[in-house]
Structure formats: structure tokens, C-alpha cells
């Protein structure tokens, strides 16, 4: 899928806009991990480096492969390391819950990812490191590959949300979800 950061001239465009308009703040949507660029992140931050949003989508490599998000855990952790090394203090990670073939092991993978990113943040920015795990429930829409996938019921999603809330809290990550 197309990402804002795929544009070959995104950094020069951001730099030109922010130098032309002093009070302009530029934001980019959640970034695919495979197209993450510290240069883009730094251009957007323009001195203020708070929270960077990445979209790994699923908590396990098995499930990322199943949904064709060919991003490795190593890619994600490398992006987090680069951001924290350059002074960013927060990483928000966006995941989907209720994907076809998802198991509680996949849900636990989200928590584990939060734990690893938090550890990387602490290594580079100490107690200022903030990690937020944000999830949305899969709602099948027309035309994408999962248009005919069965949507998890509220009773199926509730234990996943509870596990994520408790698990994220135990590893020092914030958790939020959208129904």
C-alpha cells in the first residue's frame, strides 16, 4: 500500500514548507515500518521529537506474513532504535485485532513487541521513553483481501483487549483501542 514516506522528495518538501512558514507543523500518518525514514521523522519533528507512529499491524511474523505485511520484528525494532537514538521519546505502534487466523499467541506478540520497544527506549532516553500500543478491531470492507472474512464478535474480542490491557500495563506500555 502507498505510504506518504514513499515519495522520493518528501524530505525536501517538508524542509521547504517548514522553512517558508515558521509556525507550520507537519504531521505524517502512521508509517509503514518498511518505509520508515529517520530523515523524514527528523524533518517533521523540526526540533521537537515526541511520538513517532509505526504500523506493524500484527503481533507475530506468522500473522504479518498472512496479511502480506512483510515487515520483520528486526525492521520494527531497528526503526524504534533509530528513533530513540535520535532523541524521539515516544513510539506509538498500531495493530489490528481480530485478523483471520489470529490466536492468543499473536495477541501476546503485540505485548512482547511493546516490551522490546520500551526496553530500547529506556536504553536511549531513560525514563522519558513512552510506548503506546494502539489497536483497532478488524472490520472487513469491500474489495480488500479480507472482505469476506468473518468479523470477531464482541465476546471474542473482549478477552483479547483484556489481555492486551493487562499485558501492556505489566511491561510499561500504554494501551488504547478503537471498537
Task: Kindly give the residue locations of the regions a language model identified.
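Conserved SAM/AdoMet-binding glycine-rich loop
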Residues: 1-130, 136
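Auxiliary Fe-S-binding modules of radical SAM enzymes
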Residues: 84, 107-179
Amino acid at each position: 500500500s502507498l505510504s506518504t514516506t514513499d515519495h522520493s522528495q518528501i524530505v525536501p518538501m517538508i524542509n521547504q514548507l517548514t522553512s517558508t512558514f515558521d509556525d507550520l507543523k507537519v504531521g505524517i500518518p502512521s508509517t509503514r515500518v518498511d518505509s520508515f525514514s529517520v530523515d523524514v521523522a527528523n524533518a517533521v519533528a523540526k526540533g521537537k521529537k515526541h511520538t513517532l507512529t509505526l504500523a506493524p499491524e500484527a503481533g507475530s511474523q506468522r500473522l504479518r506474513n498472512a496479511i502480506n505485511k512483510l515487515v520483520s520484528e528486526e525492521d520494527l525494532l531497528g526503526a524504534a532504535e533509530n528513533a530513540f537514538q535520535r532523541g524521539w521519546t515516544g513510539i506509538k505502534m498500531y495493530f489490528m485485532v481480530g485478523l483471520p487466523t489470529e490466536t492468543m499467541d499473536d495477541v501476546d506478540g503485540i505485548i512482547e513487541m511493546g516490551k522490546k520497544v520500551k526496553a530500547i527506549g529506556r536504553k536511549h532516553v531513560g525514563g522519558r521513553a513512552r510506548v503506546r500500543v494502539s489497536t483497532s478491531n478488524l472490520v472487513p470492507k469491500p474489495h480488500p483481501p479480507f472482505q469476506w472474512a468473518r468479523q470477531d464478535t464482541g465476546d471474542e474480542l473482549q478477552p483479547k483487549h483484556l489481555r492486551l490491557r493487562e499485558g501492556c500495563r505489566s511491561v510499561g506500555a500504554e494501551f488504547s483501542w478503537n471498537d
